[in-house]
Amino acid sequence: MKTIIIIPARWESVRLPGKPLAMIGDKPMIQHTWERACESNADEVIIACDSKIVYDAAIKFGAKVIWTPDAETGTERVFGVFKQKTKDVDFIINVQGDEPFINPKDINEVIKVVHSNPDKVATMRTDLIGNEGKDPNVVKAIC
């Protein structure tokens, strides 16, 4: 079963414009995220972007990149790539571009879940800390 990871990267981020290329150490955030995703058991990792500057940077560090039209959310951007890849892909995992410290083992757990339950949707989550539950910028999952 072919599983790919699509990493949406938006240059015009509302809260932090240019976020994909924000430097963490000596690498841009999107490169860290891509490298972690590449360490997983996914068959392919693709960056979906809307900006020439992000596209060029990702190509430079070796990523496969697909240009996507304007989208309101990262999930919309992932769906744009999904529509192009549906013929040869069984599962798509959406890893947000601002997850430079994501653990590849956690991605592998999601891969195991979707392979075992192909008619289900899986989402990684963690417990909220402190006032995160009230922060509109923190995504919440109801379990």
Residue ranges with predicted function:
Residues 42, 87-89, 116-120:
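Short, high-confidence coil segments that cap the C-terminus of an alpha-helix
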Residues 103-143:
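Conserved core of the sugar-phosphate nucleotidyltransferase
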Residues 2-49:
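N-terminal glycine-rich phosphate-binding loop and ensuing alpha1 helix
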